[in-house]
A protein has these predicted regions:
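NTP/phosphate- and nucleic-acid-binding module
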Residues: 1-216
């Protein structure tokens, strides 16, 4: 979509979102109920930015959206979920995109966003995506193990691989920056979290069968 025509700085940030059916060949040993499956629906967005300032602003907006969605679902930050700043490993160039300066800058930017929000978070090394660091919203399952519900990620790789550029106000081509965000995450996974959270007794508006009339 982005490459369908030349893009101006006036069009950025550009938010492209979809609810898509995806398939992932997860190993059988890690498949877990609705939490980790091979076929799932993902609410995903790619936000294309012109500069670091736009990226930080979009990350803040994405976290606001995630907090709003969580509140609507009846989830409370600090009690039902928490933020994790997922960092890369500069020494592992086979696993992570190799650009130490970019990693340092992006991780610092995400850390600043979390600090400016005055919210509690923890940092986890070697938990980033191969293409960049991320902020993960972690929820604890009934077995006490944490898993990721929502996420906001920096992506160093996509702009380079697809040669994504825009025309700045001086008429010069410049590379874009990309943020991934998922507002409600994987539908199957959040359904599993909510079923555990409410012990199967979902709120009326969320229950698939809201009222049943039984003859006596």
């Amino acid at each position: 979509l982005y490459l369908s025509k030349p893009r101006s700085y006036r069009e950025l940030p550009m938010r492209i979102a979809e609810l898509a059916k995806l398939y992932r060949f997860e190993l059988s040993g890690v498949l877990t109920g609705l939490i980790r499956v091979r076929s799932f629906c993902l609410a995903d967005a790619h936000i294309i930015c012109a500069d670091e300032g736009q990226m930080k602003s979009e990350v803040k907006g994405a976290l606001d959206l995630i907090d709003h969605v969580a509140k609507v679902l009846g989830l409370e930050m600090g009690k039902n979920y928490r933020y994790r700043l997922s960092l890369g490993d500069r020494t592992n160039t086979k696993k992570y995109y190799e650009d130490p300066a970019a990693w340092e800058k992006a991780e610092g930017s995400l850390r600043e966003v979390l600090q400016e929000r005055n919210c509690e978070f923890f940092e986890a090394a070697d938990e980033a995506a191969f293409y960049g660091p991320k902020i993960d919203v972690q929820m604890t399952k009934i077995n006490g193990v944490e898993d990721t519900a929502f996420t906001v990620q920096y992506d160093f790789v996509m702009p380079k691989r697809f040669d994504l550029k825009y025309i700045d106000r001086d008429g010069q081509e410049k590379p874009v920056l990309v943020v991934h965000r998922s507002s409600i995450g994987c539908i199957e996974r959040i359904a599993a979290f909510l079923l555990e959270h409410y012990n199967g007794n979902l709120p009326l508006w969320l229950a698939p069968v809201q009222v049943a009339i039984l003859p006596v």
